[in-house]
Amino acid sequence: MKKILFTVFLIPLFSNVFGQETKKDTLKPIQMEEVIVIGKKAQITDKQSKTLTSIDDYLQKSAKVDMIKRGAYAWEPIINSMPTERTLVTIDGMRIFGACTDKMDPITSYVEVSNLSEATICSGQEGACFGSTIGGSIDLKRNQNSFGTKKWNFNLNSGFETNNQQKIIGTAINYANKLFYVDTDFMLRDAENYKAGNNQEVLFSQFKKMNFSATSGFKLSKNKLIEASLIYDKATDVGYPALPMDVSIAEAIITSLKYEYTPLNSIVTNWETKVYFNTIMHQMDDTKRPFVPIHMDMPGWSKTYGYYSKMKATLKSHHFLLNLNSFYNKSLAEMTMYPADP
């Protein structure tokens, strides 16, 4: 009887001992030198920069941006389904306010893709770098040349779109040396009425637009530079088929002067200060629309003065950004109603 009990008590003891043992991994570690990913190759047309497309087509590729289309020109960008009153759109950090009471002159219409370096799109408070916002922000950054060896660069672009018989011609002239650079860009668009499916003409969808942009920089020293920029944009005979009115003329002048300082051997990596001024004139009317017993003219003007001073710093693995900005805007709009047959 004693032998039987001794055997019974040993069984759980040995089972516990075997349970504590771990098996050795027989697979040896392998040092990987490269990883090859096999996938579908993108088409070359998707990689190339389409310099003749519109800024509206460029922005609507983002999942955060939707476009309100009232015509073939100057679509209104909506960030995260928020209206423009709750979002912020800037050009190189400059605050610009439209002059149209019906939002027919979005800020994005004053930049051409041929002169666009990148569009920084932020959601919510991430986009509060150049002002308060709820929905987010879009900052359109234009191309900027760099100092280097003396060279000239010439570009000439032309295109034609069959849907609205749009004629496009653009040119760019750039020059740079060790102390000075200048970039110029010109784009002209002339479009007739758009034709939808079954060759159906959409009346009052024509537009004409001219855009000129220039940027010039001068190196004051090894780590200091000064830069001046100008944008002149003029659109005429712009039709909006979704509205009872059209735009006879829209004109904008945007100027700025920037000073940039890059400290040496300091936690401050960059210090940029800019002063800017812009003025916009926008005039809507319905004089070309048929069967309008009471005409209505709606001109608007907007002027903005502002500045910002932005500092970047790095301390070990931490990055800091300090931005001080201010602006003053004066907007004026009028409405005149008169009978078509006084």
What are these regions (language model features)?
Residues 75, 134-136, 152-154, 167-171, ...:
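Hydrophobic, lipid-facing positions within transmembrane beta-strands of outer-membrane proteins
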Residues 48-59, 75-78, 90, 106-111, ...:
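N-terminal periplasmic accessory domains that precede
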